[in-house]
Amino acid sequence: MSQQDKKLTGVFGHPVSDRENSMTAGPRGPLLMQDIYFLEQMSQFDREVIPERRMHAKGSGAFGTFTVTKDITKYTNAKIFSEIGKQTEMFARFSTVAGERGAADAERDIRGFALKFYTEEGNWDLVGNNTPVFFFRDPKLFVSLNRAVKRDPRTNMRDAQNNWDFWTGLPEALHQVTILMSDRGIPKDLRHMHGFGSHTYSMYNDSGERVWVKFHFRTQQGIENLTDEEAAEIIATDRDSSQRDLFEAIEKGDYPKWTMYIQVMTEEQAKNHKDNPFDLTKVWYHDEYPLIEVGEFELNRNPDNYFMDVEQAAFAPTNIIPGLDFSPDKMLQGRLFSYGDAQRYRLGVNHWQIPVNQPKGVGIENICPFSRDGQMRVVDNNQGGGTHYYPNNHGKFDSQPEYKKPPFPTDGYGYEYNQRQDDDNYFEQPGKLFRLQSEDAKERIFTNTANAMEGVTDDVKRRHIRHCYKADPEYGKGVAKALGIDINSIDLETENDETYENFEK
């Protein structure tokens, strides 16, 4: 039956006799509580909004196909990469970070870049951003980042003072802040930006040899960005500009593509690497660890229903497949818990049964989880009436030892180690990034920073100028000039191991 031919029913199939007139006592009288369709409709409506994501709330998504173009089987035995030309169905969700569901797409902000690959060995989620680094390297700061970039508890407004007080309280944040204040801080749309796995992951092959890897996704559409002025004009007329661009491009057959690359570092190279190779505030230089092409993905199908496929999409870095593994990256380790936990709160314990999250490459009929029950357990018959314990005499829930991973390298005793004693090289990489910019691009960094710091107190501005100066004197002087602050009035010699308590007041 076509959608047009369907007649109105309640959620349990009862025919609805009148959808416009409530049941009342007399033509003008009060409503009767026996108008079951009215009660059902309103109670359903009252509950139809689910909790929004704590970060990355405003998002757009599409389905597509990943195709292997180069052989990397010497690094990994993951079946998704097993042969050139192999294709895997996938889903991608892009997002802003700080804004709520109704936020404007063209804001200066990081963009989420989350990919879900439906492989024959289970779902692989790569939960990244459009930047290769992050503001900090210890997950204990996650909650504070959320509060600093979200709404102030007193005014209920976004507050630049909170943003910059937090960011400048962490000297290691300068690398990410520099990217955010650069031209790439406002992508023109979702199709014209790169993506990054950001974290360090690992791969292992049939011989159990492990290498550390970083994932890169380079847009085949080219990089295009917006100035602050261009973004303001777009926001004034279209708050959904990026979502509209992606949807309309796919709808008319202009399918966007990205090329997947990896950087590879051996375990021996990691031991001798200048910096901590698992530090999320730093990159691996391409001249030392060149990009290796892997494949490409194309987004070629829009969701039929936004709520079903985009709002209910659940990504978690714990969704990883044989041949791929984690690393000692503290931020990645923290996300291994927080993402799945957030999805269980937002969508329920059985969110894996929602169609967009199901392991399509395996087939829902072939999975055999030990979990049972819980709200909305509907898809797999709750494992039926079969054995629900282990060990048992029926061979159910037997392990698959052939998928055992190689030993994971660790080092040291459990302790709350001071990260600043381990590494205080905060400014080398943002300095190099700044020097890579053209003169015009540098000027835009200065101007964008001044625009973003409007209303911020002088002590926080001076703190940021000092960090910029340590990265490169020209950087610090340019930001100071844009902010109208005399560079000579700032103590530029504060020690590198400064902490929040030691900042000048």
Curated annotation (Swiss-Prot):
Keywords: Heme, Hydrogen peroxide, Iron, Metal-binding, Oxidoreductase, Peroxidase. It is an enzyme of class 1 (oxidoreductase). Heme binds at residue 339. The active site is at 56, 129. It catalyses: 2 H2O2 = O2 + 2 H2O. SUPFAM superfamilies: Heme-dependent catalase-like. One of its GO terms (molecular function) is heme binding. GO terms for cellular component: cytoplasm. Its EC number is 1.11.1.6. It comes from the Bacteria. Induction: Induced by hypochlorous acid. Positively regulated by the ferric uptake regulator (fur), in a Fe(2+) dependent manner. Negatively regulated by PerR. One of its GO terms (biological process) is hydrogen peroxide catabolic process. Its cofactor is heme. Coiled coil: none annotated. PROSITE patterns: CATALASE_1, CATALASE_2, CATALASE_3. Residues 1-25 are annotated as: Disordered. Decomposes hydrogen peroxide into water and oxygen; serves to protect cells from the toxic effects of hydrogen peroxide. Involved in resistance to paraquat when fur is absent and to tert-butyl hydroperoxide. Is important for survival under glucose starvation and desiccation conditions. Not required for virulence although is necessary for nasal colonization. Homodimer. Belongs to the catalase family. PANTHER family: CATALASE (PTHR11465:SF61). This is Catalase. The lineage of its organism: Bacteria, Bacillati, Bacillota, Bacilli, Bacillales.
